[in-house]
């Protein structure tokens, strides 16, 4: 039995799941009720009638906080393999982890000094 024969099962499963998905999608689309009235076409805003435009502008500080969150979230992602293999780490691994943490800490202190996190 070759490698190509083993992939036949995967292709059959993929074809069946794709066909079933397409059939169910079109079945739901053609059987749904298509009654459009004014209340159904309005946007839902916490049970109240919508007032104002939903596409308002955001303050730039929200974006800065989001970027900082992404940076430190990635830091945790990069530090996870170190924490899992801490018993078998060498001196080089420890030094690389320490340099990585120092660079991120310096960046965080720089953000605080520049006032990127001040909301006043």
UniProtKB/Swiss-Prot annotation:
Its EC number is 7.1.1.2. It is an enzyme of class 7 (translocase). The chain crosses the membrane at residues 7-27, 62-82, 89-109. Keywords: Electron transport, Membrane, Mitochondrion, NAD, Respiratory chain, Translocase, Transmembrane, Transmembrane helix, Transport, Ubiquinone. It is a multi-pass membrane protein. InterPro entries: NAD(P)H_OxRDtase_bac/plastid, NADH_UbQ/plastoQ_OxRdtase_su3, NDAH_ubi_oxred_su3_sf. One of its GO terms (cellular component) is mitochondrial membrane. It catalyses: a ubiquinone + NADH + 5 H(+)(in) = a ubiquinol + NAD(+) + 4 H(+)(out). One of its GO terms (molecular function) is NADH dehydrogenase (ubiquinone) activity. It comes from the Eukaryota. PANTHER family: NADH-UBIQUINONE OXIDOREDUCTASE CHAIN 3. Core subunit of the mitochondrial membrane respiratory chain NADH dehydrogenase (Complex I) that is believed to belong to the minimal assembly required for catalysis. Complex I functions in the transfer of electrons from NADH to the respiratory chain. The immediate electron acceptor for the enzyme is believed to be ubiquinone. This is NADH-ubiquinone oxidoreductase chain 3. It comes from Dictyostelium discoideum. The gene is nad3.
């Amino acid at each position: 039995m070759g490698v190509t024969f083993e992939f036949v099962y995967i292709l059959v499963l993929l074809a069946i799941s794709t066909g079933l998905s397409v059939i169910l999608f079109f079945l739901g689309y053609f059987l749904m009720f298509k009654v459009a009235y004014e209340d159904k076409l309005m946007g839902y805003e916490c049970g109240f009638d919508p007032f104002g435009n939903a596409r308002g502008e955001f303050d730039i500080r929200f974006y800065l906080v989001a970027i900082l969150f992404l940076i430190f979230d990635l830091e945790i992602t990069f530090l996870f393999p170190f924490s899992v293999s801490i018993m078998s780490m060498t001196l080089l691994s420890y030094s690389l982890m320490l340099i990585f943490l120092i660079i991120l800490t310096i960046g965080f202190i720089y953000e605080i000094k520049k006032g990127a996190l001040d909301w006043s």
